[in-house]
Amino acid sequence: MAEMIHLPRSTFERLKMYRKVLEATKKPYISSDEIARFLEINPDLVRKDFSYLNCQGKPRVGYDVEELRKELDDLFGVNNTTNMIIVGANDLARALLSLDFSKAGVKVVAVFDTERENVGKFIGEFAVRELDVLERVIRRFDAEIAALCVSKDRAQATAEFLIEKGIKAVWNFTGVHLDLPEGVIVVEEDLTQSLLTIKHLLKK
């Protein structure tokens, strides 16, 4: 199977959508035409994307759903759990804790906050910790991801502190563009931008 780093970004994004389709189907086999119809894309594009995987379709039968799912799970690292911390003890953190990240191979191991008055309070099953113990927790749980939910004015400084203490990837919910060292993974989650997409589609 091709390493994820060699995949074109557009292919990577589509493979995530294919995985979602496979999770929903109850059939043992599925064709590229069926996937294409569901996602309203060209079947040739589906077949081209699947050429990156060690999973061959059968003529007039399609792809083995279970085999294809395993290939995609391996590609996305779903079978290897990665630990994540949440920084920012607020309603957004509560919303994140209500989600099942195990489907992505991710486990939340701790919640932190920059405000000392929130330390010791509970969000779900987690007692909020102070940032003074961040490095110790990162080492103990081998946490690699931080979901950043702090206020905009604290976003850059907090992100820099997280990287300094050993975090490798930041899932950024602050709405602020982060300027971090090369090699640090940053994924921006801007809900406003998603709404702009919806508004654009409503115009059509």
Curated annotation (Swiss-Prot):
Cellular localisation: Cytoplasm
InterPro entries, sorted: CoA-bd, NAD(P)-bd_dom_sf, Rex_DNA-bd_C_dom, Tscrpt_rep_Rex, WH-like_DNA-bd_sf, WH_DNA-bd_sf
Entry GO CC: cytoplasm
Keywords: Cytoplasm, DNA-binding, Repressor, Transcription, Transcription regulation
Key word Transport present: no
Entry keyword annotation includes Repressor: yes
Main location: cytoplasm
PANTHER family: REDOX-SENSING TRANSCRIPTIONAL REPRESSOR REX, REDOX-SENSING TRANSCRIPTIONAL REPRESSOR REX 1
HAMAP family on file: Rex
Family: Belongs to the transcriptional regulatory Rex family.
Listed name of the protein: Redox-sensing transcriptional repressor Rex 2
